[in-house]
UniProtKB/Swiss-Prot annotation:
<comment type="similarity">
    <text>Belongs to the succinylarginine dihydrolase family.</text>
</comment>
<feature type="binding site">
    <location>
        <begin position="19"/>
        <end position="28"/>
    </location>
    <ligand>
        <name>substrate</name>
    </ligand>
</feature>
<dbReference type="GO" id="GO:0019544">
    <property type="term" value="P:arginine catabolic process to glutamate"/>
</dbReference>
<feature type="binding site">
    <location>
        <position position="254"/>
    </location>
    <ligand>
        <name>substrate</name>
    </ligand>
</feature>
<dbReference type="InterPro" id="IPR037031">
    <property type="entry name" value="AstB_sf"/>
</dbReference>
<feature type="active site">
    <location>
        <position position="174"/>
    </location>
</feature>
<comment type="subunit">
    <text>Homodimer.</text>
</comment>
<dbReference type="GO" id="GO:0019545">
    <property type="term" value="P:arginine catabolic process to succinate"/>
</dbReference>
<feature type="binding site">
    <location>
        <begin position="137"/>
        <end position="138"/>
    </location>
    <ligand>
        <name>substrate</name>
    </ligand>
</feature>
<comment type="function">
    <text>Catalyzes the hydrolysis of N(2)-succinylarginine into N(2)-succinylornithine, ammonia and CO(2).</text>
</comment>
<protein>
    <recommendedName>
        <fullName>N-succinylarginine dihydrolase</fullName>
        <ecNumber>3.5.3.23</ecNumber>
    </recommendedName>
</protein>
<keyword id="KW-0056">Arginine metabolism</keyword>
<comment type="pathway">
    <text>Amino-acid degradation; L-arginine degradation via AST pathway; L-glutamate and succinate from L-arginine: step 2/5.</text>
</comment>
<dbReference type="Pfam" id="PF04996">
    <property type="entry name" value="AstB"/>
</dbReference>
<feature type="binding site">
    <location>
        <position position="110"/>
    </location>
    <ligand>
        <name>substrate</name>
    </ligand>
</feature>
<keyword id="KW-0378">Hydrolase</keyword>
<dbReference type="InterPro" id="IPR007079">
    <property type="entry name" value="SuccinylArg_d-Hdrlase_AstB"/>
</dbReference>
Length: 448
């Protein structure tokens, strides 16, 4: 049976802006208060989807969340009509208004953790939407992400959805950005590598903690997901992220490593006690595992964070054994990083034989590269057929969405623009039309 890795990219919302809301995300902090271009951001994302679809990959999308989040404004004490809520928040707590307007749901690698049916005891695809409690602007996404995934993957014969993990610091979960799956091919059972930044409960004296920036994913959360998803404990590894890397801006593991099938591309300073982690992978692998370890002399952690090399997508084209690296254009612009990539492509010892550079500047300036923008969902033929078909991409749908973006999206957004109530109504009109395009029904709060 055919098994595909469906890439579900986040469609960038109309309120994409730069507010520096994410501690430990250096690009987000450095570009705070810059002027954004939501239309360009959305079109860059659509072009990414188009390129991967035209390469022969299965491609879908997750729609933007409703913004501003009026319910969150209400919870934070801003009452009245929507216009009054927005005005009060802008005057007294503009940073909270910015959080309520955040378009960060576009980074769907944080939407959930997904387990392939070939890995689970009940042979179903398992989903746990991430609670994202580390940041207010991300935490507000959790419930709607769960609702979306339950709608899109609604057939209980094939799909199993779990509740959010408890909303506590002890079970802080950031989704698939801290999960990798290594396997002979997507059709074979795999090794599930869960990466955490801290252990909260019990004895953790042998592990260090970051000092400058917070660790977001807990070991307790990763362990709970592995249990809930009915994964074989013998095929699961829990690895601690290098705290020194976190302090250099590696806020998720997908900023410092990327896996695809039997290939693991990783920086040598990605993990705490990295030699042991890689030995575990080799020991558990019943397939020819290829580990490509990039040294700090080749590329420093800081350079990896600046260019998001490891936040590239590593993909296998249909009916081919070779792989393509889908990298941000920032990698091409950095001579040292480009030289490293050229070396990877030229090396016959690994299956990566080409690279494709993407312009994702709008997302990159907020700390999100190609891998941040997609949630990987392994599906066989039956599972693919059983999911909601309206969000699956083809060129016709991409053309419709491009026209929709041109119709509704502004070409410039500054922080003071968030005080304009008209932006709210522009967003609602756009989302109302989008649900019809994607056949999602009345899924947004304002539609009920």
């Amino acid at each position: 049976m055919n098994v595909y890795e469906l890439n579900m990219d986040g469609l960038v919302g109309q309120t994409h802006h730069y507010a520096g809301l994410s501690s430990g995300n250096i690009a987000s902090t450095n570009n705070a208060l810059s002027i954004s271009n939501p239309q360009a951001a959305a079109r860059q994302g659509l072009e990414k989807m188009r390129q991967l679809y035209n390469m022969g990959l299965k491609q879908g999308l997750l729609p933007p969340h409703q913004r501003p989040n009026l319910n969150l404004l209400y919870q934070l004490g801003f009452k009245g009509t929507p216009s009054e809520q927005i005005n009060k928040a802008y005057k007294t707590a503009p940073e909270l208004l910015s959080a309520c307007y955040s378009a960060s749901s576009m980074w769907t690698a944080n939407a959930a953790t997904v387990s392939a049916s070939v890995d689970t005891e009940d042979n179903k695809v398992h989903f746990t939407a991430a609670n994202l409690i580390s940041n207010l602007h991300r935490h507000q996404e959790a419930d709607f992400s769960k609702k979306l995934l339950e709608f899109i993957f609604s057939n209980s014969d094939y799909f199993n959805h779990h509740p959010l993990l408890p909303k506590s610091m002890g079970t802080s979960d950031e989704g698939a950005a801290n999960h990798n799956r290594l396997c002979q091919s997507h059709a074979h059972s795999g090794i599930n590598l869960f990466v955490y930044g801290k252990k909260v409960l019990g004895n953790h004296q042998f592990e260090q903690s970051p000092i400058k920036y917070p660790a977001r994913q807990t070991k307790e959360a990763s362990e709970a997901i592995a249990r809930n998803h009915l994964l074989n404990p013998e095929r699961v590894i829990f690895a601690c992220q290098n705290p020194l890397a976190i302090d250099q801006g590696v806020f998720h593991n997908d900023v410092i490593s990327v896996a695809n099938e039997h290939v693991f591309l990783v920086h040598e300073e990605a993990f705490y006690n990295q030699a042991y982690v890689l030995d575990q992978l080799r020991e558990k692998a019943d397939f020819p595992l290829v580990i490509i370890q990039i040294s700090k002399e080749q590329i420093s952690v800081s350079e990896a964070v600046d260019t998001y090399l490891f936040n590239s997508q590593l993909i296998t084209l249909p009916d081919q054994k070779n792989m393509i690296l889908i990298a941000p254009a920032e990698c091409q612009a950095n001579l040292k990083v480009k030289t490293c990539i050229d070396g990877l492509v030229a090396d016959p010892q690994n299956p990566i034989n080409s690279v494709y550079y993407l312009d994702l500047k709008q997302s990159m300036r907020n700390g999100g590269g190609p891998a941040c923008l997609r949630l990987r969902v392994p599906l066989n033929d039956y599972e693919l057929k059983a999911m909601h078909q309206g969000i699956l991409i083809d060129n016709d749908l991409l053309d419709i969405l491009d026209k929709w973006v041109l119709k509704y999206y502004r070409t410039e957004l500054k922080i003071p623009d968030l005080a304009d109530p008209q932006l709210l109504y522009e967003c609602l009109d756009a989302l109302d039309e989008l649900t019809q395009i994607l056949k999602l029904g009345s899924i947004y709060p304002f539609q009920s």
